[in-house]
């Protein structure tokens, strides 16, 4: 593969992101003496210790967002607005930090968001239980008063990723790329607009959803379980949040929803968002030149996609 960053390159990128977060925090009046990197994959997540503030600095972005800082700012703005609103309703979330203005901050080529620091409790995740807890999150999000774009996590991401892979047979074999393009050509008309979705699935409700598997993004803290990482928050069907979660978790969601008299999952919609999620994994190979660990990390998802029948 060509153009793969060295460990030194990756460490330098992380250091730049940390420096930007520290500088932005200090400019906003925060005390920062001992910044700690909590996470470093698609974003560098920094605790600005001793302040109870965590900064998320995206460093590896899909091609469409990398080329459009305004779109990135808008997505971050949406996340802060939705999560701030949820916190005000008493929904268990990791909220935006109350110590700084609730707005993305641009510095040194990065755009970052500021969140309250929480103490993590190490615990084996129970995804079926987490899926059941997503029902209450969906009930709350159904009332969100703001306007959000429809299925924004798909818009530009899959098509642009496949475009990048067109010239990278070292990342994706031409036969795989041809299959992926064919599948996306069939899915895109359904997922690209509310109108296309409604035509295929008449009567299926669209609402505000988390956008990135809340069962996998439920954080266990010393003060309880908190929903987190709403970076892909969007308008869409509830099924989007249960994509690729598996039958046990799907059933747990349905049981919890039925007990409350709330909508259960539509398996037809779930099949479509599962197919799109598999294609997202394929398109994510376009990010390997920026994040080499993805090459290994994506293998299980790619094997699953190759083993599945092509999307009709």
Question: Each PLM stretch: what is its role?
Answer:
Residues 1-32:
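Juxta-kinase regulatory segment immediately upstream of eukaryotic protein kinase catalytic domains
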Residues 2, 121-182, 206:
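A cross-family kinase active-site recognition segment
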Residues 2-9, 152, 161-171, 283-312:
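ATP/Mg2+ or Mg2+-diphosphate-binding catalytic cores
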Residues 11-19, 57-108, 124-132, 136:
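A conserved alpha-helical element in kinase catalytic cores
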Residues 28-49:
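ATP-binding glycine-rich phosphate-binding loop
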Residues 59-63, 108-124, 163-174, 278-296:
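A glycine-centered beta->alpha junction motif in the catalytic cores
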Residues 208, 219-271:
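Active-site Asp-x-Gly
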Residues 212, 216-218:
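Catalytic-loop signature of eukaryotic-like protein kinases
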């Amino acid at each position: 593969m060509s153009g793969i960053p060295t460990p030194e390159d990756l460490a330098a990128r992380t250091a730049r992101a940390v420096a930007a977060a520290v500088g932005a925090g200090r400019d906003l009046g925060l005390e920062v003496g001992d910044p700690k990197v909590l996470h470093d994959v698609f974003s560098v997540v920094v605790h600005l210790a001793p302040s109870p503030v965590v900064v998320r600095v995206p460093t590896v972005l899909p091609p469409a967002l990398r080329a459009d800082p305004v779109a990135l700012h808008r997505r971050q703005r949406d996340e802060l607005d939705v999560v701030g609103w949820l916190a005000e309703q008493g929904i268990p979330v990791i909220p935006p930090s109350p110590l700084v203005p609730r707005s993305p901050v641009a510095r040194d080529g990065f755009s970052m968001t500021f969140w309250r620091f929480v103490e993590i409790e190490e615990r084996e995740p129970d995804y079926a239980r987490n899926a059941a807890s997503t029902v209450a999150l969906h009930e709350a999000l159904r009332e969100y008063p703001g306007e959000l774009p429809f299925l924004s996590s798909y818009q530009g991401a899959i098509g642009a990723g496949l475009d990048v892979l067109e010239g990278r047979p070292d990342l994706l074999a031409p036969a795989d790329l041809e299959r992926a393009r064919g599948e996306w050509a069939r899915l895109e008309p359904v997922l690209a607009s509310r109108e296309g979705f409604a035509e295929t699935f008449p009567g299926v409700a669209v609402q505000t959803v988390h956008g990135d598997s809340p069962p996998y993004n439920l954080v266990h803290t010393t003060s309880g379980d908190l929903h987190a990482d709403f970076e892909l928050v969007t308008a869409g069907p509830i099924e989007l949040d249960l994509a690729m979660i598996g039958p046990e978790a799907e059933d747990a969601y349905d049981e919890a929803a039925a007990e409350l008299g709330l909508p259960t999952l539509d398996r037809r919609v779930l099949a479509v968002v599962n197919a799109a999620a598999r294609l997202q994994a394929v398109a994510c190979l376009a990010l390997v030149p920026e994040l080499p660990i993805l090459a290994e990390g994506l293998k299980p998802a790619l094997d699953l996609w190759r083993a599945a029948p092509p999307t009709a």
